[in-house]
Structure formats: C-alpha cells, structure tokens
C-alpha cells in the first residue's frame, strides 16, 4: 500500500493508521516498538502540520526500531510510513542517521523490502539531501551498494540498485549547484599535483565519490582503499559497472566537471588513465565498449581546453586502432570507427579538433591521419577486393556492399550486454569509413554555409572582392580535402557499392565540391568538377575500347525517350543546303572515317550528372570559367551519349556507323530533364556578371567545338572524338557542334529580363547577339545547317524575351521594360541582316546552295519580326526605323534573275526556281509584317518614321516577284495619307509666308530628304516634307514597267489629293517636286503605245487638280508655268502613234478646256498653247484596226473635233479669235472630214457620220457676228464640205478602192449627207449676212466659195437631205449661190473696180448656163423644173439694171448663147448643123437662112427628136424675145443676132417641112415655138416702130432682125396651116416694110 502524500490531514490519517497497525503487530513481539508507536500516535494527535511534527524527534523512532527488528512485516509497515515522511520535511535532522541505518538494515530483508528501500531512498535524498553529506552520504550510497554485493541477488534488485545508485550519484553531483550549505566546514582537495583548494561538504563528497569511481582499476589491482577515503564501497563493483557509473557522471555532470578544478584534476589523473588502460589493454569486449563510450563523452569541444594533451593521446590511440599496422582485434577497429563516425556527425567538434591538433605540425593530427589510415586500409588487399574499383563508373551485377550486409542491427558501442564481440564484417568497416567520409563532407558543407553564406559569396564576387577567407572552416576544409577527395574517388570508382550507397557517396562528394565553392577554394572546386566530368563522360576503360556495345545493347532501347530541344537535345534542323557537297565528301572519305565514340552510359553516371547539375545550380553564381567548362563539356558529351550525334554530323555518316544508344530507363532520362530544367530556372537568380561569365564560357566552348574539324584535318588527330585527352582533361565533343549554341539559347530564354538591366543587360545581349550573328554570317562553317540552327535559336531567344516582357501583368513596368528590350531585339535582327548583306554573292555561292541557306536565314528573321509585331506591336516605341529596314531586307537581296540566265553552267532550273520561290516567300512575309504595321500600328508611329514607311511601300510596289503585293502596297499609300491627315493641325502646321519661303528654299536646294530625316527639323517642316515625299514617291511608282502598277499608283495619287489636299504643303512645292517630273518625263514609243490607261488616269487627275490648285494666274507667278508644262505634256502625248493613247489625251483635253473656261485671267500664252494642241494635231489617215476595243485614228479625230466647242468658248471669252486660228481650225476640219474610211457598220448617205456631224457642229459654233473674215472662212469651209460628195469621193474611191477588201468597200464615205447639211448650213449662214464687204484678201475665199457652189450646181446632184420633201443639193447650192450672188452684187455695185467682179461675173454666167445645160434625158427630166426655177432667179438677178452693167459683153454673150442654145425644142438636123458650122456668126447664119433655097433642099416629113427640158426651152425662147425688149442696149445688141438666127432656123424648118407634109397637123410644140418667136418679133417691131416706146436706141438689133424679112415672106404661103400665124406673118411683113 502506497502512502498518500496529498496533504497533512491525509498524511496524518494514514500515519495514524500505519502506526496503529505497527503497534498492534508489535504488541506481542516487541513492546518497545509498541510503546514507541503509541507515543508517536499521541504526538500525531497533537500536531497539526509537518513543521510541528518535525519538532518531535521521537515520532520517527517506531520506524527505526521496526527496521532494526528485521521483522519483515513490521519493516514493511515502517517503510510505508517512512516513504510518506520522505516526501516532505517532517523528520528531525537528528534522526536522519538512524533513518539511513534503518534503510541499510532493511536491505537485508526480502526482495520486496529491498526494492522498497531502493524506491524510498532517492525520494528521501531529494527531501533531506542538504543534510546528507559526509558519513550520511556514505550511508545513503551504502543502501544501494549493499544490494550490489548480495550473493544470488535477483537481477531486478541488482538492476534497480544499480540504477538507483547512479541516480543518487548524479544527484550528489547536481547538488554542487546549491549555493546555501547547512554546514560551513571546508575541506582541502587537490587541483594539481602541487595545488589544492578548499571546498564545501557537498563538493568534497563529489570529489571523493568521483575519485572512488575513477579508482576502480586501482582497487581491483592494488587492494582496498582506506575507509575514510571511501565514500562509495566499490571494492566489489565490477569494472564494467564502474565504467557505466563513470559514463553516467560524464554524461550527466559535464557542467560540474567543466567548472570544478578538483574534478578536472581527477579527470586527468584518474579517469583518463583508467579509460586508456581499459581500451588499450583490456581484452574484454564489454570493458572496451564502456571505455569507448566514456571516451566519446570526453571528446568534446568543452573538454579540449582542459584535456588537450589527454585527448590527443586518446584520439591517436583510436586512430592507431584503425590502421592496418595495428595488432588490435577487429572489433576494436570497429569501435574506433564507430566513435569517429559519431564524432564526424558533429561539424563543430570536427572543426575544433582539427584546429587544436591537425592545424599544428607539432601535434598529432587527428582527422588527417584518420582519413589517411582509412585510405590505406581500404587500399589494402583485403579491403580493395571488396571495393572492386574500376576505371569507369559502373556497377557489378551483384554488389558486395549493400545496405543489408554493411550495417549491423546494433552498433558495437551500444552492445552493453555483450561480453563477447560479434563477428566482424569487412563491409561494415567499409560502410563506417564511407559514412565517416560522408559525414565529414556534409559537416564541412554545413560549416562552410554557416561561416560563409552563399549569398555573401555572391555579393563579394559582384564587388570583385576576394574573400581572403582564412577562417577555421577554410583551414579544416583545406586540410581534409585531399583525404576526403581520395576516399570519395575510391568509393565512386567502386563497382561493389549498392546503388543507394553509391548515391550517398555521390551526394557527399557533391557536398565536398559545394563546400569548395562556398569557401571560394577554386582549385579544389575545379578538382571536384574535373573528377565529376571524368566520372560522367568516361565510359571506356581504355582508348582502344571504342567499339559498339554488345548485341544485347545494340538494339535501340525501348525505354529511351526523346527529349525536347528545350532541355537537352541540340540537334539542329536538317540542312536545306544542296547536299551534293556533303554526299560527295561522304562517299569520298568513307574509308577514312574515324570510329565514333561509344554511347553507353550507366545509371550511376546519370546520378553523377544530376549531382553535377545540382552543384551547378547551387554554385552557379560563384563558379569561375573553368568550373563552367567542366559542367558544359560534360553536359555536351552526355547529350551525345543519350541522343546521338547532331543532324549536321550525321550528314557525314551512315546510320549504321553511329553507335547504338545507351540502355537507360525512362526515369533516368526524366531525371536528367528535371535537373536541367531546375538548372535553367536557377540561372534566373544570377547576377548580370555571373550570367555574363556563363555566356562567355559557352561561347568559348562553342568556338572550340566549331574549330575541332580544322584541328582534325590530319587523321592522326582525334581531338573531340573522345571525351578525355591523354592528360585526362575533358575536351569538346565533335559530334554535337550545335550544343553550345542551343545552351546559349536556352539560358537566354530563361533569363530574358536580365537584358533589361541597364548597361549590364545591354552587354549581356551584345555578347549573345554578336556571337550568334557571327555564326549566322559565317560561310566558313563546315555545315550550313549549323547556320540555320543558330538563326533558329537566336530568333527563339528574341521571341521568348519579347513574350516574357510583353505578357507581364504590370502594365507600366511592361511598357518601360519593353522599351528597353525592343532596341536590343530589333537592332540585333537588323545587325544579322546586315551581316548577311555584306557577304559577296557569286556563281559559287549560288551553285553550292549558300544563297539558298541565307535566304532561309532572312526568311526566319522576317517571321520572327512578324511574330513580335503581331503580339506586341503596340508596345514598340523606338525601333521603328530598324523594323522598316528589316522589312526592306528582301529587296536588298542581290541575287537577280540575270545571275542565272547568263550562266550557261547552271543547267538545273530547279535551283533557280527554288531561290526565286524563297525570295517570293521572303517578300510575302515581309509584306505581311508591313501590313500588320499599317493595319494596327500606323497611327501610333512617330512622324520621323513615316519616311521609312514610304520607302518600304515603294520597295513593295517596285518588286517584281508578286504582283498582288505591288497592287496592295499602292493602296497602302492611302493609309499613310490618312496618317498625315489625322496629324494635321491648322494652328501649328499652317505655313506663314516666312515659313513658306524657308521651306521652298530648302526644297529648291534639293534638301527634301534632309528635312524629313533631320532631328532638327521643325514639326511643320517635317509634316509638309513628308507630304511631298509621299506624293513624290507615289509618282515615282508610276515608272514601273507593269501597266497595272502604274495605273494603281497614279489613281491612288489623285485620290489622296482629292481627299487630303486641305492638309497639303504649298502647291508650288508639290508641283516642283511631284508634278513637274511627271509632266517632263520622256515617253518612249512603246510606253505611249501600251500605257493608255495610265495616261488617261494621269490626265484625268491632273485636269481635276489644276483648276482647283493652279487657278490664280493673277497672284501666282508660277501658275502660268505650271499650266504651260501641262499643256506641253498633252501635246507631247499626242505625238504618240497609239490611237488609244491619243484618244485618251484628246478626251482629257476636252475636259481641260471646259475647266479652263471657268478660270479667270488666263494668260494669252496658255490660250495659245490650248489652241496649238488642237490646231497642230497631225491627222494621219490610218485605220483598219481589227480590234474592237482599240481606238482608231477616226475616233481620235472625232474626239478632237467634239472638243472644239469649249476651245471656241475659251477663245471667245478672251476675244482671242484670229484669222490664223480660224484657218488652222478649218484646215483641221477639212482634213478630218475627208477621212477616207468610215467606222465599221456606219453609212453616211442619209445622215453624216459622227465625225462629219461633229465638224459641222464645230462650224456652227462660229457666230455670224464674228469678224467678216472669219465668216467668209466658215462659208468657204462649208462650201468645201458641200462638194466632198463629188470630187473628193471620187478621188478616195479611185485611190483606196483597189486596195480594200470587198467587205470594206462599204466603209468608203459618200459624203452625201454631210455635203447636203453643209450646203444647207451655208445657205442659212448666207441668209444671215446683211452686208457683204469683200476685202481684197478675202476675194479669193469668196471666189472659192462660189466655185464650190458652182461645182455642185454643175453636177446637178440629186442628193437630198434626210427628209423626203427636201430639195436636191444642187438646187440648195444654187440657192446659196443665188443668195450669195445677190449680196456680192450689192457689194460690187458700190465697188465696181473690185477685182472679184470679173471672176464672179464669169462664175455667175457659168452657173446660169449650167441651169440651161442638158446633161442626159433622165437627169434633165428630173431637174427641169428646178433648172427652170433656178434659171429664172439668176435671170432676174442678171437683168437688174445695176447688176447687168457689171457684166461685160463676153459674159453676157455667153449667157445669151446659153439661152439661145437651150431654146431649141428639137435636135438639129444635118442641114442645120452644116449651116451653123459654115457660118462664123449668128448674123451670117441669119443671112444665109434668109437666102435659103427651099427648092433645092427639102425638109422632112418626120418630126425631129425632141430635146429635153422643153419648158426651159420655151422659157429661153421667150427670154430671147424679152432680152430684145430689155432697156439695156448692150443686152439687146448681143441678143439680136441670136434671136434672128433662132427665128430664122425655126422658120426654115417650118417652111421646108410644110411643103412636104401637106395637110398633116403641125406639132403643138412647133406651133408654140413659132408663136412665141413670131409674137415676140411682132412685139419687138412694134416697139421699134412705136414712137412712144421706152426703148432707147431703137435701132440696136434692127439690122439683124431685118435679115428675117425674106423668110417672113416665104412663110406667108404656108401660114394658113397654123391658127394666127398668117396674121402674124402679114404684120411682120408690114413691119419690115415700115423699117425699110
């Protein structure tokens, strides 16, 4: 039953109960105990607290007595009470000794009581410990030590006693920290051999106790120690237990040992010698274990200052136990290694021990010797067999050293219950050494990181401050490095290690290397990196072992996974270059090829690679160039092992020549990928200087790799074909030349933002771009695929950089960063292109495919630019100039088509076609880029860039590869115009007079380019200069050979003008720079022939432009010049042989004339040029075009004629009409109207052709109120046109008829309709003329008019107008002649001396004669009425008194003769013809007929044949009579012979015939004839005989008439046959008688 210690009341009740039980139990056995118990009960009843209880010494007496009784039951009851009293101070100090004696007595009883004592004693000491010292302390310890000596003791008692004893000893030592001591007594104790100090009772107890324990070995060997010196009876304590107690003291009382000099002294002179003896001389495993455990507790940093020499001896002893030379047992070596293993886990103690021992040459080195001995041990035959090292990293099939067989369940130092050592396993010893090595590496790494953090190292490196680190860690590391390095190397080359153990070694070695880096120990880091590279890359045991893997390995591993180019692979794309060269080389050198290095690699090497990469990740910021060299070259070789040679290398080898891939699991490859990804990610934290170093190393390695081929031209050299050289230095891999280019690219893509770090970032970018560009433009590279791969990597860098910055979420920061990046990126693209452009291009470059490759390079660069613009164009700000230079790069590709055509050696047309197609593709991509800019970013461009936009457009327009691009580019000019329009600000860009003069002066001085490119130009200068530059270049595009492009360019030009002219600079500048070159361009015949549409559009635009912007002739001094050049331009174009062109020009000329009319103050020179264009037109009669869409000369002339009205209007507006102008116009009209061929399917019989009508309309425009001279010219032209249907038609028919095909004969013009209409117009115009003054100069024109009319009248043409009731043309002409004659006669009456008179009178007489002439019966019948009418009109005019006087006798005689000739109704018979031929004059004829002998010559019974036009004849008969009655004497005189002869002939025929016909009736016409003549003669005679007659000089003609008297008399006999005849004859006979 356990005593409850809850409180005094509870304790009181329990004690009372226990005391009563004790009293009851002792009642019969021991009265003393009973009385004592009762007394204690009484005491208990009186006290109320523990303090009161403590004042009663007798209270504890029953318990002491009960224990002394050795009665088990009473002792048990007493122990129960003592247990309770032990928990609280309740026993008087005076009773403590008795109580302890009671405990000692109780230890002799049963086991339960013994255990109870052991349970109570620690509690008792805890409560009353301050009073227990000296003898009491000895008694206290005796309570436990007694139980250790009991024979046949139960293990539980011994174990509990042992534990309790250790607890009490620990508490005795812990008591040293109590400052208050109940006893002031002091004791002397030694602190050295000659010194002592005084200590209190507690410390004295501890001193004696520690001395007793450390004297175990002395007691056992020298016998008992005096009682006074013994605090603990250890005479019979086993050495092992004593060492256990010592271990406990060393473990739990370290503080006291370190603070108390007396204890330290005992430690040096007692404890350590004891341990050394036990460990060196003991053959007992357990004793050695306990000793080692104690030593382990002493080998601490805290003890070094007090046990320096002792520990040196201890450690040396332990190390000696490890060595091969030691004669100690194996388990002792194990114990030493285990101890050092534990020590190695504590970096602090390692560093401390090193600095205290290894750091001094005069001291025993600890860890150096340890590592040395371990190395020697491992290299011993016994151990080296187990390691089974190899020259390459590999693993045996069944590893000898595994986790299972190299470990023990319990460490030897923990085998406390083993008296004999277990069997020794060599693998365990190896494992211990390996672990020590690992721990030391890890400890050094930890210490290095703590003493010199990596961050600080990086900062120091950035500041380029050498650390100058002479710290403890550096010394320790430097001292241990060689040993650790050799151990790690030994383990790494071991083939017997299990994989997991190998990984531990790798990790340890990695930490060793990492520590070197952290501590800036470059040589040691390089050594580690070198070993790493050798371990990883060396996969053959000797240089002769360069054969393929065995059959089992030759098959392609199904588990090997292809890896993306973003991680390890660096295989560039296959070359697009003509492979003929490489294939030829391959065939030629097949026998000379070197055998490729095997590609086998183990998983262990993969592990090492991962460690190397991990090391690069952690130490990258402080790596030097050499460390990076080992890293990258190792990486390069591994890439070859896993993925084989790069594509460029494969081109020179057959696939069967390439070694098979290694057998790796998918996880192996994945782990490599993962590690490399982490490596790339880690570089993002690199500083710019570190990153610069990495890139520099990569570039250097890349250069070295690319030069390997040249180094190995001698087949005896094989540098780069194997990873290690003769000195075991790793060298670049020739199988993977593009590796470093790939790594540069990947590193750059992971560190894009570093390029934004100001000057450092620019240097980084420059480093990369300069090298990349150098490679891209290097034609000396062995394989062009490397160039293509490089450009792909470079563009990937660019795209990644722009993507990373451009996709940033921080808008403000993004804009700023992209502004920095864009210059780097775009400048690099431009520099790349420039490097390509600078290369010469010759026949060889074309033929060997170099140009093909470089075209692919340019294409890739353009695609990159396109992607950048497509994604982030809106962020671009400063690099637009270079962007446009890049866009223009395809146009500077100097490979021309002629380079191929002139090369006869190049037979492969596919080569040419391929290059041309690539050029097309480049241009297409370039245009796509530009289109992207123009669609999305044009409005955001600065004005300083617009020049480049325009230049780019010109290049796109001018290129000949893609017509669609040329078309589309032309329309882009419109967008540039919109751009400029949007930026127009009237307030800032409008030009003052001063600004205008300044701008004009610069442009006149050919400084336009300077204006738009100079940063010093004002905004208004730049703006206006860009407009001029835009328009000028757009016009320059019209010089393109392709008609479609020319048309599009000029159309866009004028559309821009229409839409944006309000924003334009001064028009005089535009004219000077833009329009004038267009107007002064020299046109070839071919151009004029083929570019009609262009010319037409150009003229349309110009004609629209000029009236709007060049109309101020009054204020603009250059306006006249500008118009003059335009008109000269038109005139030059009209010299074209192309009818289409001329037609277009003429149409635009018409429009221009209409526009000029609206302009005021047009100068005379301009008017003159306008006229000259019209009048100087050269009409050529050429037609016969078979193309319906083509224009003919006829069309041109027609359009020209239709344009005359506005010209006339213009001339009239300024009163500039001159005779010269009119004559030239009419000359043109005259030439035009005689055009010898009509258009297809056109007839001009009933209505005039279009041109004929146009000419007539043109003539109609001339007003009758124009000058008289002009009017005469118009009349002349109309008259000339009127006769076209006659002579001109005949000439055309005669000339062209034989030459034309029959189908075209109907195209010959008849001119009938136009002649008629012209004649009609002539009559109308004549009718409008009131007076007709005839100048001498115009007389010939008038005569010509009359002659033309006379010609028409003469021909008696029956041509009529379109209306059926219209009169024939000859009558119309006669009317004109008649009207005109009337007006002329009026003029001549006033100017009788006019030279026109005689000619006109001749013409007039001729016209009258024509009306009386007989042509042919058919025509005469048709014209008789008109002839009679026309004759009558003329006769009336002629017989007017003042008019007839204008005619001379010859003219009148001609007229009278015509009348006489027309007066015959019948044809002459032979007799009459003979008579007339015999007679020279009509008077003679009359005389002869008067004396005619009717008896000899008879008439005829048949009537003679009638003549046509009898009505005219009758009229003429009457006129002959009337003429004799006319008052004009000259007329009568001239008429008399004719009338006399006429009557004589009539009478002769009548007389002759009537004698024959007898009673036959006389024909009516004969009757009429005779009646008319004889009646007229009667009238004449009456007038002559009448005194009152108005006739003057009545005798005129009487003589001639008197010759008729005989015939009159002869008629009388036959006069009765005709009614009235007889009377007339008789009257005449009487009259003649009167005359006589």
Swiss-Prot record:
Biological processes, Gene Ontology terms: endocytosis; Golgi to endosome transport; protein targeting to vacuole; retrograde transport, endosome to Golgi; trans-Golgi network membrane organization
Main subcellular location: Golgi
Entry's family note: Belongs to the MON2 family.
Other comments on record: Present with 2410 molecules/cell in log phase SD medium.
Biased composition annotated in UniProt, kind: Low complexity: 564-576
Record key words, sorted: Acetylation, Golgi apparatus, Membrane, Phosphoprotein, Protein transport, Transport
Source taxonomy: Eukaryota, Fungi, Dikarya, Ascomycota, Saccharomycotina
Annotated gene: MON2
Signal peptide: none
GO MF term list: guanyl-nucleotide exchange factor activity
Quaternary structure and interacting proteins, as annotated: Homodimer. Interacts with DOP1. Interacts with ARL1. Interacts with NEO1.
Annotated function: Required for traffic between late Golgi and early endosomes. Required for endocytosis and maintenance of vacuolar structure.
Modification sites for Phosphoserine: 564, 567, 571
Topology versus the membrane: Peripheral membrane protein
Chain intervals with Polar residues compositional bias: 547-563, 577-589
Chain segments carrying region Required for function in membrane trafficking: 1501-1636
Name by which UniProt lists this protein: Protein MON2
Key word ATP-binding present: no
Keyword Disulfide bond recorded: no
Entry GO CC: cytosol; early endosome membrane; endosome; endosome membrane; Golgi apparatus; Golgi membrane; trans-Golgi network
Region (Disordered): 547-596
Spans annotated as Golgi membrane targeting and interaction with ARL1: 60-410
Modification sites for N-acetylalanine: 2
Subcellular location(s) of the protein: Golgi apparatus membrane
